[in-house]
């Protein structure tokens, strides 16, 4: 599959603390092969949360990183929103879920996708 990756400012700022360039490249290759691999996050309008191993801390997918992204199927785009360690955040609050949904709805309306 061909797709373009877009990063939010937050993701771009956080990513180097969790993944070096080679690790990020491996994540992108995996996501290109399986863009639906992340679990759908209820109440977010289609965001997905992908579990990813954390080589720096020797953690597998279960105890490793979480990557929040949105796959825009029609546009062949993967929008990278956030990355964090499982130990830092377990689940998003209902308010955070609503904020993600509002953000993606506004962006898709602007693009004419919703």
Put a short name on every predicted segment.
Residues 1-22:
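Arg/Lys-rich, positively charged N-terminal/basic patches that mediate binding to nucleic acids
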Residues 19-39:
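Compact soluble domain cores
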């Amino acid at each position: 599959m061909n797709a373009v990756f877009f990063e939010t400012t937050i993701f771009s700022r956080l990513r180097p603390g969790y993944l070096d360039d080679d690790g990020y490249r491996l994540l992108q290759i995996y996501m290109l092969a399986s863009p639906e691999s992340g679990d759908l996050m209820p109440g977010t309008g289609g965001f997905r949360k992908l579990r990813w191993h954390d080589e720096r801390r020797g953690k597998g997918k279960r105890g490793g990183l979480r990557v929040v992204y949105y796959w825009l199927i029609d546009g062949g785009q993967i929008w990278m929103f956030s990355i964090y360690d499982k130990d830092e955040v377990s689940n998003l609050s209902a308010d955070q879920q609503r904020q993600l949904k509002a953000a993606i709805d506004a962006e898709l309306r602007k693009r004419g996708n919703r």
